[in-house]
């Protein structure tokens, strides 16, 4: 997919508009920026799991709420559907939380792992970058990292869910295969940075994760 100059301009306009809203401190303006049809319902503070047959998916501050699709316009609902299917195909349960204290995907994923009864979690940013993590690893380490969000497809997200479930069962699966495109980074770099800035606007430092229910 080609990223047009107009798409970049639109993203810049949205980012600048969000900055202006934050500066104004107006809750009315902030609430108006939320699109109808949020993907999740927030149901209270997240709790640490006790089931060893679960995988926790942690989404970024804007995922499914202020942003609705990845950098290549894979709908967030599709991403969650595929990951859920992958986990369930391995016979495991799934829980969702939202991390608002950071927009760094490594730390989002590590929070997922810490809240998961199995110790395995998946973290995903709104632009699509994804990490499979284990609670005993340091945040900047991981089990699998998927940094090139423009190359992640429906099939990839499903495979990520399956592998996370396999790790939770104590298996050592082969890493999820991904496409490799040396031009993806320069092609999408500006848009990726802008989308990350947009998500970072909704970070509330020192807040704890929220439990989510898929609508």
Which positions does each model-derived feature cover?
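Protein-protein interaction and targeting regions used for scaffolding, dimerization, and localization
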Residues: 1-37
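Flexible, glycine/charged-enriched surface loops at secondary-structure junctions
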Residues: 21-29, 91-99, 172-182
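Glycine-rich phosphate/diphosphate-binding loop of Rossmann-like nucleotide-binding domains
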Residues: 43-91
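C-terminal binding/interaction regions
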Residues: 66, 71, 140-215
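Active-site rim loops that border cofactor/substrate pockets in soluble metabolic enzymes
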Residues: 80-113
């Amino acid at each position: 997919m080609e990223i047009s100059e107009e798409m970049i301009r639109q993203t810049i306009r949205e980012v600048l508009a969000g900055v202006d809203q934050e500066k104004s401190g107006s809750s009315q303006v902030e609430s108006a920026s939320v699109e109808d049809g949020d993907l999740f319902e927030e149901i209270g503070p997240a709790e640490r799991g006790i089931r060893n047959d679960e995988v926790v998916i942690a989404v970024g501050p804007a995922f499914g709420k202020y942003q609705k699709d990845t950098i290549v316009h894979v709908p967030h609902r599709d991403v969650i559907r595929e990951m859920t299917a992958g986990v369930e195909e391995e016979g495991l349960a799934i829980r969702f939380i939202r991390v608002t204290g950071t927009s760094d995907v490594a730390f989002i994923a590590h929070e997922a792992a810490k809240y998961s009864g199995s110790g395995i979690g998946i973290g995903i940013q709104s632009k699509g970058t994804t990490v499979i993590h284990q609670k005993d690893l340091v945040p900047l380490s991981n089990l699998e990292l998927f940094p090139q969000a423009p190359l992640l497809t429906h099939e990839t997200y499903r495979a990520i869910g399956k592998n996370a479930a396999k790790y939770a069962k104590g298996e050592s699966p082969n890493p999820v295969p991904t496409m490799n495109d040396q031009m993806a980074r320069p092609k999408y770099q500006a848009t990726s940075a802008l989308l990350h800035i947009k998500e970072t606007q909704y970070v509330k430092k020192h807040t704890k994760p929220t439990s989510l229910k898929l609508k």
